[in-house]
A protein has these predicted regions:
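Internal, well-ordered alpha/beta segment that forms a basic, Gly-enriched binding/recognition surface
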Residues: 81, 89-177
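Local cysteine-cluster metal-coordination motifs and their immediate loop/turn environment
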Residues: 11-29, 69-104, 117-124
Length: 319
């Protein structure tokens, strides 16, 4: 299997208790089956075993979760913002989500792509301060690929198209010109892949980002204080767009909707520009949206249906 990662990936280090926005607070903690099987083997007299049994529960979808403590804190997060489970039985036995966050993993046949989500403030800060264009490195791992039914021809077409998208973003033009070119490229590519009709649902740009499932009230304050202004021609904005292209572009293999994926990249720069223009802004958006299935499903739907997010509407915002 071929493993692809951004070159900055190896430099990421969790700052644990010093994190300004703990990933152990604000959202549910899923308990995966493999971890649960291990917890069953723990000595019943162990304090950590008893704590696990006390807080283990089911959500409305019958998924195994740990009941959150007050202020939506993970029940194993101690007063120093460190994980008691990690301390007691080792990080390798924490739930899969905890072991991998903020990393994301996408498998496409014999290729695995790995990255770091903006929902981690350290990762967002790394991308915000990174100089130069987003670069990648690859290595071979002796591991069987995950079986999936992707169409090889479509995968190759989209992979080549994604490289074109990266090339557009890496040009010497002003970022607004690059984003316009990127969006028009996606529109043409979408016509080749098949119709993906845009609707005219009346909703304001601000209301798009007033998520029904609120994790951090600070995000809503940012949305309420939106300021429309020109996009800064910075590495940070280029890297924001490149992040979305890397993370989402190839998902079009499954639904042939490449236009929405590219819209997400372009709108990501508008989010940064209108709501705060710093790493914290992008971090909060990511935590609020990318890590809430409800909010993310709503956002993906609006990328197709909202009048303010139609291709021509976004192009007007880029002028």
């Amino acid at each position: 299997m071929i493993i692809i990662k951004p070159t900055y990936y190896k430099d990421f280090k969790c700052i644990a208790g010093d994190c300004p926005d703990s990933c152990c607070q604000g959202w549910e903690v899923d308990a995966d089956d493999k971890s649960l099987e291990f917890y069953k083997t723990l000595n019943p007299s162990l304090e950590i075993k008893q704590r696990i049994d006390r807080v283990l529960d089911k959500d409305e979808f019958d998924n195994n979760i740990f009941t959150l403590a007050p202020k939506k804190r993970c029940p194993f997060l101690n007063d120093e913002n460190l994980c008691d489970m990690h301390i007691a039985i080792g990080g390798e036995h924490t739930p899969f989500t905890c072991r991998t966050f903020p990393r994301f993993i996408h498998d496409f046949g014999g290729t695995r792509e790995i990255g770091i989500s903006f929902s981690c403030p350290v990762a967002a800060d790394m991308m915000n301060n990174m100089q130069g264009h987003l670069q990648f490195e690859s290595e071979y791992m002796d591991e069987l690929p995950t079986l999936n039914d992707i169409d090889a021809a479509t995968y190759i077409k989209l992979k080549n198209a994604r490289q074109t998208a990266f090339d557009i973003l890496a040009s010497d033009k002003h970022i607004t010109e690059r984003l316009q070119e990127l969006l028009l490229f996606a529109k043409d590519l979408q016509e080749e892949l098949g119709d993906c009709e845009e609707a005219n649902v009346p909703i304001s740009f601000q209301d798009v980002f007033r998520n029904p499932e609120l994790i951090n009230p600070e995000w809503l304050e940012m949305v309420d204080n939106m300021q429309i202004k020109p996009i800064s021609n910075t590495n940070a904005n280029e890297n924001i767009a490149a992040y979305f292209i890397y993370k989402y572009f190839l998902d079009a293999i499954f639904d042939l909707d490449v236009l929405s994926k590219v819209k997400m990249a372009v709108v990501g720069v508008l989010i940064n520009t209108y709501f705060g223009e710093d790493a914290w802004t992008v971090h909060l958006w990511s935590k609020e949206t990318e890590h809430s299935q409800y909010n993310m499903d709503r956002y993906k739907k609006l990328l197709k249906e909202a009048q303010c997010l139609k291709t021509n509407s976004i192009l007007c915002m880029l002028k």
